């Protein structure tokens, strides 16, 4: 769910006004971003531009309006994967969801009318996020997972305040898919569970996976068969006096990443089935690990009862509670003029961006967050929950747990990114990355 880079190997445009420092400022609940770099990314780093788009955490940013408003839900079916025209690189995307439904980092491909997420040798994989947020709805995808120890495929919903609903496929176990959920990133390893898949081959066979997210319940289904149901009422926490239930607008994300990378936490590697084999059958031919996505559908539900509706275009947070009641639907614009712009001033750099000037308005370390396709809630993490409420209640569905996928990973335009893993842990009530060394190469 979240990653905060401990160091970044920068490969930026020749910028005249960008700081030479290799590390962006860090952010947490107790240390918000400075006004100069007001947006807190999923990785707990501060910046402008893409830092302020999808994944920007308003609770750790300079102010709630540092992050851009997020495009409202759009019901749609995606089934023509004959090209990648509907995907924008995260080093190019500035928030116009009307031009690109998806933003990506890594190595997406198309083959036989399907979308492939690929992971070449020693790379950090691929992550694709839908640019239209969902505030309750149903998502369904036809998937053939990746395979192999240490290789993980994700199909999830993730909000900017780190509510999360997951499907995770561990390549060492092709007979099951893992389900999980989180509220504001609070770690509770009792929230996970395994769902068996008929035929016992998530890699070789197509299966249809559905998340049906309603204000009062979440249902996970495989091939139309309900595998798990979570009732909101079962998530009430007596300590915090609140429901630890995913309830804020979320992005659909698809990912493939190396959970079994040698640099990861031992518990993470064990959960992933062992260290990844970079000389495996798939690495030899076709030359990469891969997960295959076919038709993907999004059905948007009506806003919850009592929702604060002031428009029809975008979601914003109006208070720092990060709850369903904190969300407002507005007509605010969602598009930045440049990578130097933020939610505080979305028109910064309009003229220089148009002229192609290489300065803070170009993509760089402090304007495009970097990470990889996996993050968060990893086994072996000893850190505790975020809201000071202790461990949230469990629905008793099992104790299995896995990673959740984040967003905003940087795309490499040549070769492979450095093999590192950004893992989410909690720092007070927010996240800090354990490992993040990614070579950022802008397109």
UniProtKB/Swiss-Prot annotation:
Disulfide bonds: 56-67
Name of the molecule in the record: Crh-like protein 2
Covalent lipid adducts (GPI-like-anchor amidated asparagine), residues: 416
Gene it is expressed from: crh2
Top-level taxon in the UniProt lineage: Eukaryota
Start and end residues of each stretch annotated as Disordered: 350-420
Reactions mediated catalytically: Random endo-hydrolysis of N-acetyl-beta-D-glucosaminide (1->4)-beta-linkages in chitin and chitodextrins
Phenotype when the gene is knocked out: Does not affect growth rate, germination or sporulation and displays only minor sensitivity to high concentrations of Congo Red, even when all crh family members are deleted.
Gene Ontology molecular function: glycosyltransferase activity; hydrolase activity, hydrolyzing O-glycosyl compounds
Enzyme Commission number: 3.2.1.14, 2.4.-.-
Residues the record lists as binding chitin: 168, 257, 268
Database matches in PANTHER family: GLYCOSIDASE CRH2-RELATED, GLYCOSYL HYDROLASE-RELATED
Protein's GO biological process: carbohydrate metabolic process; chitin metabolic process; fungal-type cell wall organization
């Amino acid at each position: 769910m979240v990653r905060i880079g401990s160091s970044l190997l920068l490969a930026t445009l020749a910028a005249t006004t960008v700081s030479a420092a290799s590390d962006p400022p860090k952010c947490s609940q107790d240390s918000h971003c400075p006004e100069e770099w007001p947006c807190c990314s999923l990785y707990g780093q501060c910046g402008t531009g893409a830092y302020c788009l999808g994944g920007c955490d308003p609770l750790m940013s300079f102010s709630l309006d540092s992050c851009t408003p997020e495009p409202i839900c759009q019901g749609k079916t995606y089934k023509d994967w004959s090209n990648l025209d509907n995907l924008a690189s995260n080093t190019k995307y500035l928030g116009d969801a009307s031009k690109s439904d998806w933003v990506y980092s890594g190595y997406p491909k198309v083959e036989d009318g399907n979308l492939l997420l690929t992971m070449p040798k020693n790379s950090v994989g691929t992550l694709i996020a839908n640019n239209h947020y969902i505030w309750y709805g149903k998502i369904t995808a036809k998937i053939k997972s990746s395979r192999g120890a240490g290789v993980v495929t994700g199909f999830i919903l993730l909000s900017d305040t780190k509510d999360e609903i997951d499907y995770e496929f561990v390549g060492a176990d092709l007979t099951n898919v893992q389900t999980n959920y989180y509220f504001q990133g609070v770690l509770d390893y009792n929230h996970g569970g395994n769902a068996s898949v008929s035929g016992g081959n998530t890699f070789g066979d197509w299966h249809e996976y559905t998340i049906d997210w309603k204000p009062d319940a979440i249902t996970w289904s495989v091939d139309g068969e309900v595998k798990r149901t979570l009732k909101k009422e079962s998530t009430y926490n007596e300590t915090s006096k609140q429901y630890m239930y995913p309830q804020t607008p979320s992005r659909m994300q698809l990912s493939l990443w190396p959970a079994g990378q040698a640099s990861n936490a031992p518990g993470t590697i064990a959960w992933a089935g062992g260290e990844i084999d970079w000389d495996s059958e798939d690495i030899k031919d076709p030359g990469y690990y891969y997960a295959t996505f076919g038709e993907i559908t999004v059905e948007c539900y009506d806003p919850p009862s009592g929702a604060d509706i002031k428009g029809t275009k975008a979601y914003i947070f109006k208070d720092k509670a990060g709850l369903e009641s904190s969300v407002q639907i507005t007509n605010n614009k969602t598009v930045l003029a440049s990578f130097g712009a933020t939610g505080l001033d979305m028109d910064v750099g309009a003229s220089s961006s148009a002229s192609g000037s290489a300065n803070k308005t170009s993509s760089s370390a402090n304007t495009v967050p970097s990470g990889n396709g996996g993050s968060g809630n990893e086994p072996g993490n000893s850190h505790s929950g975020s809201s000071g409420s202790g461990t949230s209640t469990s629905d008793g569905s099992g104790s299995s747990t896995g990673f959740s996928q984040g967003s905003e990973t940087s795309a490499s335009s040549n070769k492979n990114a450095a093999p590192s893993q950004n893992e989410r842990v909690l720092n007070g009530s927010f996240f800090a990355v354990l490992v993040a060394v990614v070579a950022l190469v802008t397109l």
